[in-house]
């Protein structure tokens, strides 16, 4: 399996945002943009892997600016990282007003994809050839994001496992919620995983 460059699978998708894509507020529906992001992530990952890929996680989707009907939405996607069977695809989304030529950055995100073999099980993907400092930085950034995510997940699991209702109720005092049930000593038993 020969290593592949970032450019080998880099994909740019541009689509006109039509009225049927609008939400109740008249802007392009975020769900449509997410669907397009998933499609372009699949195209990039499958081209690099040379096989069918599935979406495993989507990280950091933030809608920075609204997309208007009539604008051209462009999704620029490339492989940022490869593991054994997984790939991280970085996607930058911009929209362009065709009348004014104004381009605005609307989204970016990272899709983790896993390559599947004929048997439906994860299969090895080609190594990624890093041809410049930007590609190297993106690869390293992906490793750092994975590490931070793993640490955050472990911390949240520990917090969940150590739930102490009396202590954790303090957190709720300034929140927008109401507790409308009787709290008793046996309540913590409801939260144990055993």
What residue spans do the PLM features occupy?
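Anion-recognition interface
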Residues: 26
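Conserved interaction-surface patches within small, structured recognition/assembly domains
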Residues: 54-64, 72-80, 95
């Amino acid at each position: 399996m020969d290593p592949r460059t970032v450019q080998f699978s880099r994909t740019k998708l541009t689509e006109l945002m039509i009225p049927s894509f609008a939400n109740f507020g008249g802007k392009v529906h975020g769900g449509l943009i997410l669907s397009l992001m998933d499609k372009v992530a699949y195209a990039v990952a499958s081209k690099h892997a040379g096989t069918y890929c599935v979406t495993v996680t989507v990280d950091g989707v933030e809608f920075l600016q609204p997309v208007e009907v009539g604008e051209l939405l462009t999704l620029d996607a490339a492989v940022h990282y490869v593991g054994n069977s997984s790939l991280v695809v970085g996607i930058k989304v911009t929209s362009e007003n065709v009348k004014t030529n104004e381009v605005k950055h609307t989204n970016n995100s990272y899709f983790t994809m896993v390559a599947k073999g004929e048997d439906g099980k994860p299969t090895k993907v080609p190594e990624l050839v890093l041809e410049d400092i930007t590609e190297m930085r993106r690869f390293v950034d992906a490793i750092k994001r994975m590490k931070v995510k793993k640490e955050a997940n472990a911390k949240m699991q520990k917090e969940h496992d150590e739930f102490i209702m009396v202590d954790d109720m303090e957190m709720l005092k300034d929140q927008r919620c109401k507790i409308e049930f009787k709290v008793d000593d046996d309540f913590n038993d409801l939260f144990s995983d055993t």
